[in-house]
Amino acid sequence: MNRENQKIKYFEAFRYSRISEKIGEYKDYPTESLEKEIEALLIDAKEEQVKRKADNLAYIILFFLNTSLYTKSYKYMLIAADESLYINKPLSIRYWVPDFTNEDASLIRKELVQNKAKIPDLSEAEIEEGIRVVLKGYEGIIAILWKKAVEKVLCEDMFKNKDIEEIPSVLIGEYMGKLKKVEILTD
């Protein structure tokens, strides 16, 4: 097996073991910082909606930003939009950085450096690639936290006692890519 294939297999196995460990750790992770961002997003969206006389809020979206893995900002974009999601400017945009990603990136780096015996002579660029591969796998964890935070804000706080039709659709996915609907519990 050539070095590139060996490296890819190693990074994927490393990501799988790391994510398996972290899912249990983060599934009960507090979502207050994300909830605050969602609340601010919705408040800004309502203000913009009144200012623009725009349609009602139709979507709340969390976008995964691949560029943030390269810039090491580890940001996720939150958008509130009306029906014209990609056509017009969104009603509101905010960014959320999970407080655990910077620390995890450092731990991943340390583990990759310590495990150089498995892939000898990992360059700095290859270590950075390994960090990106592992953190890309955090999307599942972020999706769990997103669902939990959105349910709290929409169903327990801002949209409590509202008809289900009044609650905007909640989506998640790659920026300018495929989006998935998040089914939220409204009870």
Task: Report residues per predicted region.
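Short N-terminal edge-element motif at the start of the domain
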Residues: 8-57
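Conserved aromatic-histidine-acidic binding/catalytic patches
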Residues: 26-33, 130, 134-141
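Acidic, proline/glycine-rich low-complexity IDRs
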Residues: 1-11, 133-187
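Short secondary-structure junctions and interdomain/linker hinges
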Residues: 45-52, 115-122, 126, 149, ...
